[in-house]
């Protein structure tokens, strides 16, 4: 049941010494991957999402403004183009914010649900690499939802339902954890409290059990971690954030 062996045996994916941590998808793997992408687009369209695509590389100034440079630079790949420093994106969020800021919006447009299958790169230590579970390049299923404060609870519940629908289809079991403010974070205590309260309120209305994971939130916000079990009973994490 080792997925790395199955990947080769079934012609799904492989890894090469020329690119450690960077998966090569084979013909059968692309058939499966494209079917999953088609399904992703179908369910997101039904849920009221629009789809965008943002560049895999953006200038370093953006990463300073977003806070990623101060909190995540050791995990980022960088380069210089025409004397301007750039970085491969480790997360899709800053690009998604640029798209939103590119045109004016009215409160009547909200909630605005935006989905992206963005390719991200993260400098993982070689000893931590493990098949497709821990890689240096992967496609991240991301959603950025722009909303008013009074819409937060319903939107979080909507995301949780979408995740539950997908996991149920594939027969995954999961449990939820609420991860709160870490020591290394941006934003004020008041902003963190408001965001955390929104997640707690939504979780309570969902009526499903969850545990609180103190101090394990992202540096930019609290999050709900969906821990699912694979066929070997190992725990994997799917993250949903406000």
Annotate each PLM feature.
Residues 80-83, 147-148, 229-233:
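Short acidic-glycine loop/turn motifs at beta-strand connectors
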Residues 40, 116-117, 139-140, 163, ...:
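Extended, hydrophobic alpha-helical segments in both membrane/secreted and soluble proteins
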Residues 9-27, 134-190, 214:
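Conserved alpha/beta enzyme-core scaffolds, especially Rossmann-like or related mixed alpha/beta domains
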Residues 235-242:
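Residue-level detector of conserved catalytic or cofactor/ligand-binding positions
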Residues 76, 223-227:
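Short acidic loop-to-beta-strand element that houses the catalytic metal-binding Asp/Glu
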Residues 1-124, 128-129, 133, 145, ...:
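Auxiliary tRNA-acceptor-end handling modules of aminoacyl-tRNA synthetases
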Residues 37, 41-58, 62, 170-216, ...:
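Gly/Pro-rich turn-and-neighbor structural signature
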């Amino acid at each position: 049941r080792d997925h790395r062996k199955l990947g080769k045996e079934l012609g799904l994916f492989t890894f090469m010494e020329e690119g450690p941590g960077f998966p090569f998808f084979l013909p059968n793997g692309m058939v499966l991957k494209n079917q999953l992408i088609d399904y992703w687009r179908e369910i997101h369209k039904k849920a009221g999402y629009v789809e965008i695509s943002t560049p895999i590389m953006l200038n370093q100034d953006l990463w300073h403004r977003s806070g990623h440079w101060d909190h995540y630079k050791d995990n980022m790949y960088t380069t210089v183009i025409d004397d301007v420093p750039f970085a491969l994106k480790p997360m899709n969020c800053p690009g998604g914010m640029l798209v939103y800021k590119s045109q004016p919006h009215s409160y009547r447009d909200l909630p605005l649900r935006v989905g992206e299958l963005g390719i991200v790169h993260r400098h993982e230590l070689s000893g931590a690499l493990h098949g497709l579970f821990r890689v240096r390049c992967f496609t991240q299923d991301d959603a950025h939802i722009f909303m008013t404060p009074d819409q937060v609870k319903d939107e979080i519940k909507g995301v949780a339902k979408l995740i539950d629908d997908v996991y149920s289809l594939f027969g995954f079991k999961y449990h939820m954890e609420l991860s709160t403010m870490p020591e290394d974070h941006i934003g004020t205590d008041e902003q963190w409290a408001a965001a955390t309260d929104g997640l707690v309120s939504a979780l309570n209305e969902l009526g499903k059990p969850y545990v609180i994971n103190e101090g394990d939130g992202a540096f930019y916000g609290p999050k709900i971690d969906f821990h699912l079990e694979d066929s070997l009973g190992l725990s994997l994490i799917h993250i949903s954030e406000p």
